[in-house]
Amino acid sequence: MVVAREEGAGIGAVMLLDLGADDPALRFVGVVEGAVDARVPLLEAAAQVVREAGGRSLRWVEDTGEMPLGAVVALEELGAVAGDEVHRWWRHEVTEGMPAAPTARGAAQPAAEGASFRVGMGGAWCDVEVVGDRAVLVHDRQEEGTAAALAALVSLAVRQVTAESAGIRAVETCVAPGDDVFEAALVSLGFAPTTRRAVEYHLAWGT
């Protein structure tokens, strides 16, 4: 763990994970948290730790919606390269209305840490977290399923969170590249893709 501090208080951190890969360029990944302004010194320090451990690169994921242009430029100057898209955020303005609620009720399930609740249907589920006036859905499923079934699940999650939490103005969720079924479900409910996305960054150095 590499931590950035300001006046004794932690303002950011990089948790380094050793995947044990034989290729030193693929061995280490980082989980970055905290202030965007601390990114460059944090990553420089993390890269040094990885280098001393025998790694030849560091990979991590950044949410571009939370990064000002100055931070993007600073990462480029550091030598970090933006790579593949991990997921893109989709958004629905609640004031636009939702289709009629499904007649089926999802089964109550234990929610992930930080989530307000979880709804599930079959082998699919959504954890729902309230962040200010936004509801954030984290979706997962065991099988591909159908767009209609996923739309019913998302509709149920949206209706439950708007009924239980006053002031929700928008619902957001993320979609992985190529997940056409989930995209179709979201489109049917009035969701639209945004410019916010998560991408994998890669910082490499010589031997």
Across the structure, where does each feature detected by a protein language model lie?
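Conserved active-site alpha-helix within GNAT-family acetyltransferase domains
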Residues: 64-84, 177-195
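Intrinsically disordered, low-complexity segments enriched in Gly and acidic/Ser/Thr residues
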Residues: 112-171
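Hydrophobic multi-pass inner-membrane translocation pores used for secretion
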Residues: 146-159, 168-207
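Hydrophobic beta-strand segments of well-ordered beta-sheets in folded domains
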Residues: 23-28, 55-61, 134-137, 167-174
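Conserved donor-binding loop and adjoining core beta-sheet/short helix segment
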Residues: 1-44, 121-147
